[in-house]
């Protein structure tokens, strides 16, 4: 079987070129595109200012290529207008977008006006956000799950990210779906009693577990609706529900396997960061503790931590790398700029 990396870094992110390199680089564009929204940010390195633009979804799997590209360009235009600059003044632009076919987004952007832009999968942006674009691992667990890492010699590896039908183990969707399954097993006696049963009826406004099961096939729930139920799973786990806690332990084990695969295939050893990105980690210790234990079983010195900076920060860090000014702004200062800009919108 082919064992080449599923995701690699574009040459421009390993050998910076940029439109305007070095001291001439002032404006960098970063974009974070997902299944629900798109955020563009223009970073003014001279004035230490950030200008944002917002648009709808840009995940091609969710809305198609045409609408995805339109969202990216609409968000960009807003951010450029906020910065009072033209497109040609950008030193670099990095688009981190969710979906299975970022190459299609790349082609369509090149066919419009963005022939110099760098398009990567959102897991690459997440890795950069988590590690400061340095050797280490970024592990996403939001609605879906995905893990990506870069080793000290530049080797890359992705594990997971196969979508909710074939994967997304350890994600909010997985937790929500398995919580409903646990309620079904409680009802038919094939599983232990759990407070997830009553919680599922209230959350999905269903009169019975049987009706909930039937409705899934007649009016399928969206990924977001299923993933949202994981909040209830978290609440019940903290309240001591055994089944809810077991689900988080299973989620940690499955996601931990993917993280271990990334560590093994990138050659990461010793002290390196493993950044946890996504809404599922808001569950706290019921999820993060068993996941950390799973990681430390193979990498005892790894630093495991929840990432606080918004994902668009990773795109901006990669943009600075692309135009040869990596380190012009550290992660802490960038995170503060993003937090302030988001608070004003």
Residues of each region from the PLM?
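Broad gene-expression machinery/nucleic-acid interaction feature
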Residues: 37, 92, 144
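Phosphate-binding/catalytic loop of phosphoryl-transfer enzymes
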Residues: 96-194, 331, 342-345
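Residues at the starts of beta-strands that form the adenosine-phosphate
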Residues: 92, 116, 273
């Amino acid at each position: 079987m082919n064992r080449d990396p599923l995701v690699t870094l574009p040459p421009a992110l390993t050998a910076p070129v940029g439109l305007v390199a070095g001291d001439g680089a002032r404006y960098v564009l970063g974009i974070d595109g997902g299944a629900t929204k798109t955020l563009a940010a223009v970073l003014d390195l001279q004035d230490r200012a950030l200008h944002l633009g917002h648009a709808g979804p840009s995940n091609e799997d969710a809305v198609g290529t045409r609408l995805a590209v339109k969202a990216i360009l609409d968000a960009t235009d807003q951010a450029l207008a906020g910065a009072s600059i033209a497109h040609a003044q950008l030193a670099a632009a990095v688009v981190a977008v969710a979906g299975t076919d970022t190459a299609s987004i790349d082609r369509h952007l090149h066919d419009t006006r963005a022939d110099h832009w760098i398009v990567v999968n959102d897991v690459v942006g997440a890795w950069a956000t988590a590690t400061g674009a340095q050797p280490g691992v970024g592990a996403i667990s939001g609605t879906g799950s995905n893990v990506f890492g870069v080793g000290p010699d530049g080797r890359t590896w992705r594990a997971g990210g196969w979508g909710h039908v074939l994967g997304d183990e350890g994600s909010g969707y997985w937790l929500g779906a398995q919580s409903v399954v646990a309620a079904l097993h409680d009802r038919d006696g094939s599983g232990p009693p759990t407070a997830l049963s009553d919680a599922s009826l209230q959350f999905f406004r269903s009169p019975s577990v049987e009706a909930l099961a039937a409705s899934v096939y007649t009016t399928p729930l969206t990924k977001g609706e299923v993933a949202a139920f994981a909040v209830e799973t978290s609440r019940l786990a903290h309240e001591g529900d055994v089944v809810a806690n077991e689900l988080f332990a299973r989620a940690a084990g499955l996601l931990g396997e993917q993280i271990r695969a990334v560590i093994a295939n990138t050659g990461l050893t010793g002290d390196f960061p493993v950044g946890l990105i996504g809404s599922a980690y808001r569950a706290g210790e019921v999820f993060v503790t068993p996941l950390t234990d799973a990681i430390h079983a193979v990498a005892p010195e790894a630093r495991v931590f929840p990432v606080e900076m918004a994902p668009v920060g990773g795109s901006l860090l990669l943009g600075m790398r692309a135009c040869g000014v990596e380190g012009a702004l550290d992660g802490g200062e960038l995170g503060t700029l993003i937090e302030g800009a988001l608070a004003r919108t």
